[in-house]
Amino acid sequence: MTTRIDTKFAELKAEGRPALVTYFMGGDPDLETALKVMKALPKAGADVIELGMPFSDPMADGPAIQAAGLRALNAGQTLAKTLYMAAKFRKEDDTTPIVMMGYYNLIYIYGVERFLTDAKASGVDGLIVVDLPSEMDAELCIPAMKAGINFIRLTTPTTDDKRLPKVLHNSSGFVYYVSMNGITGAAIADTAKVGEAVRHIKKSTDLPICVGFGVKTPEQAAAIATHADGVVVGTAIVNAIAGELDEKGKVKGDPVAAATRLVHALAESVRATRLEAAQ
């Protein structure tokens, strides 16, 4: 099974550069605006899109992403509408991978089989489900693999050598290395330690390693890019969108332009870093 994620990372490896993986919250601040943001991301330089599934109790998310999820839910966003966003995007872009990220409760209530059928039909390529450990592979991971959808796992600085093989077992697409312990949007980790961790994980897998949590600026993204196959940026993009909203969470400025300006700067920095390192 070769997915869009596999194809994208193979292309980037041939180009000698890492991926820019961009996260935003589905339905934030409303469905129409979020869909415009999603469609604009690849043109701004995003290689992979992480599409957040808003949830009422997001335990791993920092204040910015929690607020984005709340805005989306208040605007009427549902899992069905998030899948609709993927389907609308896919009609115009058949190459950029879409990874849906969120919590298992949403999928469980929707129905696993129904969700996987609808996700595949909508052009979704991968899933990151932060609260579903490898011991529960039969719940979603294995059915997703059978449906042709990558199941992407998180590793952290506390994932030891005993735990790592269990985390990597049945993982596909790429490995998401969380560069620090804590919630999204916290301070960036020491890049040298990130490099050590990535090299260590690579001894146990051939999958690309993408690093996220705490990456906010083009300079930080460039520093991480020297060590990883991909850089994940989420909170900074969510904050760029939020900066164009009023106190009630309604659009007052141009969230699409704000998000794409940031992504363009991130993409330029990430790509230049690897090119400089190769010279």
Curated annotation (Swiss-Prot):
Q: Which GO terms describe its cellular component?
A: cytosol
EC no. given is 4.2.1.20
Report the protein name in the record. Answer: Tryptophan synthase alpha chain
Q: Which UniProt keywords apply?
A: Amino-acid biosynthesis, Aromatic amino acid biosynthesis, Lyase, Tryptophan biosynthesis
- Relate the protein's function as given in its record: The alpha subunit is responsible for the aldol cleavage of indoleglycerol phosphate to indole and glyceraldehyde 3-phosphate.
Q: Which reaction does it catalyse?
A: (1S,2R)-1-C-(indol-3-yl)glycerol 3-phosphate + L-serine = D-glyceraldehyde 3-phosphate + L-tryptophan + H2O
InterPro entries per record: Aldolase_TIM (IPR013785), RibuloseP-bd_barrel (IPR011060), Trp_synthase_alpha_AS (IPR018204), Trp_synthase_suA (IPR002028)
Note the subunit structure. Tetramer of two alpha and two beta chains.
At the top of the EC hierarchy, this enzyme's class is: lyase
Active site: residue positions:
50 (proton acceptor), 61 (proton acceptor)
Q: Does the keyword Protein transport apply?
A: no
Q: Report the sequence similarity comment from the record.
A: Belongs to the TrpA family.
Q: Please report a single Pfam family linked to this protein.
A: Trp_syntA
Q: Which Gene3D superfamilies match?
A: Aldolase class I (3.20.20.70)
- Pathway(s) served: Amino-acid biosynthesis; L-tryptophan biosynthesis; L-tryptophan from chorismate: step 5/5
Q: Which residues form the signal peptide?
A: none
Please list the GO terms describing molecular function.
tryptophan synthase activity
